[in-house]
Curated annotation (Swiss-Prot):
Compartment(s) where it occurs, according to its Swiss-Prot or TrEMBL record: Cell membrane
GO cellular component, one term: plasma membrane
Name of the protein described by the UniProt record: Receptor-like protein 50
Positions of LRR repeats: 105-130, 132-152, 153-176, 177-201, 203-225, 226-249, 250-272, 286-309, 310-334, 336-358, 359-383, 384-407, 408-436, 438-453, 454-477, 478-504, 506-519, 520-544, 545-568, 570-591, 593-614, 615-641, 642-665, 712-736, 737-760, 761-784, 786-809
Organism the protein comes from: Arabidopsis thaliana
Protein family per UniProt: Belongs to the RLP family.
Side of membrane Extracellular, spans: 23-849
Amino acid sequence: MITIIWSLCLIFCLSNSILVIAKDLCLPDQRDALLEFKNEFSIPSPDSDLMLILQTTAKWRNNTDCCSWGGISCDPKTGVVVELDLGNSDLNGRLRSNSSLFRLQHLQSLDLSYNDLSCTLPDSSGNFKYLRVLNLLGCNLFGEIPTSLRSLSYLTDLDLSYNDDLTGEILDSMGNLKHLRVLSLTSCKFTGKIPSSLGNLTYLTDLDLSWNYFTGELPDSMGNLKSLRVLNLHRCNFFGKIPTSLGSLSNLTDLDISKNEFTSEGPDSMSSLNRLTDFQLMLLNLSSLTNVDLSSNQFKAMLPSNMSSLSKLEAFDISGNSFSGTIPSSLFMLPSLIKLDLGTNDFSGPLKIGNISSPSNLQELYIGENNINGPIPRSILKLVGLSALSLSFWDTGGIVDFSIFLQLKSLRSLDLSGINLNISSSHHLPSHMMHLILSSCNISQFPKFLENQTSLYHLDISANQIEGQVPEWLWRLPTLRYVNIAQNAFSGELTMLPNPIYSFIASDNKFSGEIPRAVCEIGTLVLSNNNFSGSIPPCFEISNKTLSILHLRNNSLSGVIPEESLHGYLRSLDVGSNRLSGQFPKSLINCSYLQFLNVEENRINDTFPSWLKSLPNLQLLVLRSNEFHGPIFSPGDSLSFSKLRFFDISENRFSGVLPSDYFVGWSVMSSFVDIIDNTPGFTVVGDDQESFHKSVVLTIKGLNMELVGSGFEIYKTIDVSGNRLEGDIPESIGILKELIVLNMSNNAFTGHIPPSLSNLSNLQSLDLSQNRLSGSIPGELGELTFLARMNFSYNMLEGPIPQGTQIQSQNSSSFAENPGLCGAPLQKKCGGEEEEDKEKEEKDKGLSWVAAAIGYVPGLFCGLAIGHILTSYKRDWFMRIFSCFSSPLKK
């Protein structure tokens, strides 16, 4: 009994000791380091109970056990902090290299994601020699990755994603992190090539390098990553062929290499059509794949006829390439396939789906915009689970009865654009149809069967022959949000009822009257190329806080652009070719997302809006043919158009001198940069929002060329023609190496043509005509191989026209009215050429006299000798002939 009592006492004492130890587990130096680290940042006071819960550090207090604090885990034996999880904890400040954080040297996991650290990654980060997990996602880091990270030899997870200003190249030494399993660097600004040392990370299972600015090809060493399951290289600027070594990644389940410039050998490079290409072999070897996205590249291969080895495939997207040949029927037999997107390729021939015996799991099928022909196979109706179907621009060779598609009862999205349809008003769509796209279907009447649709979300009936007015019942459809009726023959006044439409596109019709006030709540409004009159509705000023796209070009609108209608989310504004007047709206300075701005051919009277340079995303600015005046540069103006691709201020009354460094800082025109658009909130299902339905006129040598969609992005242009600019052409123009079109004609520029123009290696059109330029045409311009159009006429240039195929192929009118110019293609010879021609002529004359003399002397001797022979021997035949000529004389 005594023994039992003593045992119970011992257990009680030990348990109390353990509790005491547990209570005092936190080491003082660890607690102090944590509290000091917290005080290094500004943390807003929680304004609600929810914020109090979210702020992990809110209950950190001195004289309490730090191992019980939120976000903290300690080693149960030593009491050191081994895990610090402060993700999304409202930390605002700068993580310094001497931060108390680095005193927690036993950390194994550090998560500071979604805080504002506003710093370069300190070299001290390499001091965490036991660190296994480092998560700095979305921390506003900038600069380059420090080399000290190579010291984190135990690291298994590294996430530096969504740090928009994290730059430089991926370090070759990152290949030393041989225990790494997860590496995520998405949405940064990394450049350069992928180091081959990345192939040393043989334990890597997840690699995400998407949304960066890399260059070059993928290294063959990527094939060493045998454990890799997820590979995401979306939008990285890679090019070239995919290494065949990737075919050995047998564990790969998710592959996304979309939106790059990867290529593959096409059918023409195959010695035999029976031989599988390297690309086909690589694809078939990846038998564990479940998700494949190869879209928006430059692949030209044919798909293998038998793809049954990819039995686990659930999603297969190769859209936006140049795949050719027939679509293999084996694709439709894959048992797990849910999504198949083969759109926008060069597939041809009839579609053969094959005999589908078992129920198909296929839910999404996109095969539009190819070269498929022949009748639509009835076997497509066996895909009873289809919820989305796109067969756009299928050459059926005749009229297709719309009713056959109504048998697919699960359809929610249907795109039959470009197919000649027979539509009856008695048709009944499935009640859950959400997206219906019937563009270019030869429809002549508004589809009345839409009147009772209760789920329709997106309707596109553009590019048909529908006449009359838009039926009022359209605006009563309860779920309708996106409407495109452009390129029809709708007429009369546009009668719209108040509704929650997000996007309304009605350009290229015959609407007239005033723009109805009901449009004021719309986020995307495109009414270009109609006959609207009156003013821009003033309701925009007070109602619409979500307007993102406003296109009203080529109407008869008058008045001013409403000053208060332009809010922060505006992304594209085109009111060109109207009768608008007044001043340029200064409220545009609030539109930080603005990319496309066109007010051409109006009557706007104002000075140059230099404050537009503060808009960080502006890519196109067109002020052409207005009444703008004054200088386009002001002293002290240090800003530049960093992302501008198209700059047209022609046909105004701008004046003044441009400083020599005026074009410094025009980054996109200076170097090749593929702008990645991370602007949130503009995705629209089924509508090409990227193009904004943009249209801009480019003038080259008097000819107008309309750039539609993304054309302005390709033709990087500066047009300042038809103004009163004077002084020298800025020498800094030579920085803009990506410039395609440069027009500075019809101004008062003086001085010499800057030799730096020869640096514009991509220039295709150059117009400097009708200025007061003097001196010679720089000879280096003759070496610009793409310069197909040029005009130097009506200046005061002199000297020889440079040699070069492109220059010599120009019409002489391109150099006219420059009295001092000479040489081809002008008729006027240069001074040196005239002397050379004269010397050559004199030399030729001398040679001819010498030749005559050389011929005369032997001829004389020869003649005398022959005469002597003839007169001495007097042959009978000679005397008879001679006597015939001489006898008349004797008479």
